[in-house]
C-alpha cells in the first residue's frame, strides 16, 4: 500500500471570526493586482492565516465563487512558509472568467510574494 501525503490547510491557518477579518482589514497594508486585493497584518505567531472574501455581487454563481476560493487557498497552502507571522485576507475585486483559473492562481502567488518581500 502506498502512503498518501495529506494536502490540507490546517484549521489554525484560517481566519474564521468577523473580528479577525476586521482587524486585518483595518490594518490597511494592501497589495493589489488586476482582479485580487490582499490585506495583510503582522501577528506574533509562527504560522500564517488566511481569510477569503468573494462577494456575491462580484461573482453571482456559487460554483464559481467556491472555485475561486479553492484556487486561492491552494496558492496559500503552497506558499504559506514565506508568509509566517502574517494574517492575510484576499478579496476578489472584479468578476473573472472561470477559464482564467491559472491567472487567478498566478495573481494570488504574485501578491503573496510581494507581501513576503515587503514585510
From Swiss-Prot:
Tell me what reaction this enzyme catalyses.
Endonucleolytic cleavage of RNA, removing 5'-extranucleotides from tRNA precursor
Known EC number = 3.1.26.5
Query: Per the UniProt record, which residue ranges are transmembrane?
Result: none
Pfam families according to UniProt: Ribonuclease_P
Q: Which InterPro entries match?
A: Ribosomal_Su5_D2-typ_SF, Ribsml_uS5_D2-typ_fold_subgr, RNase_P
Can you provide one Gene Ontology molecular function annotated for this UniProt record?
tRNA binding
Q: Which Gene3D superfamilies match?
A: 3.30.230.10
Source taxon at top rank = Bacteria
Q: How does it assemble?
A: Consists of a catalytic RNA component (M1 or rnpB) and a protein subunit.
Q: What does this protein do?
A: RNaseP catalyzes the removal of the 5'-leader sequence from pre-tRNA to produce the mature 5'-terminus. It can also cleave other RNA substrates such as 4.5S RNA. The protein component plays an auxiliary but essential role in vivo by binding to the 5'-leader sequence and broadening the substrate specificity of the ribozyme.
- What HAMAP family does this protein map onto? RNase_P
Q: Which family does it belong to?
A: Belongs to the RnpA family.
Name recorded for this polypeptide: Ribonuclease P protein component
The source organism is Nitrosomonas europaea (strain ATCC 19718 / CIP 103999 / KCTC 2705 / NBRC 14298)
User: Which lineage is the organism of this entry classified under, starting from the top rank?
Assistant: Bacteria, Pseudomonadati, Pseudomonadota, Betaproteobacteria, Nitrosomonadales
Amino acid at each position: 500500500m502506498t502512503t498518501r501525503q495529506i494536502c490540507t490547510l490546517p484549521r489554525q491557518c484560517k481566519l474564521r471570526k468577523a473580528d479577525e477579518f476586521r482587524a486585518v482589514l483595518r490594518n490597511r497594508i494592501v497589495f493589489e493586482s488586476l482582479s485580487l486585493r490582499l490585506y495583510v497584518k503582522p501577528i506574533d505567531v509562527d504560522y500564517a492565516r488566511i481569510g477569503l472574501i468573494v462577494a456575491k455581487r462580484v461573482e453571482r454563481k456559487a460554483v464559481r465563487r467556491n472555485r475561486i476560493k479553492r484556487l486561492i487557498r491552494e496558492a496559500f497552502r503552497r506558499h504559506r512558509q514565506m508568509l509566517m507571522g502574517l494574517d492575510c485576507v484576499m478579496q476578489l475585486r472584479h468578476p473573472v472568467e472561470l477559464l482564467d483559473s491559472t491567472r487567478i492562481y498566478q495573481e494570488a502567488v504574485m501578491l503573496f510574494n510581494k507581501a513576503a518581500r515587503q514585510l
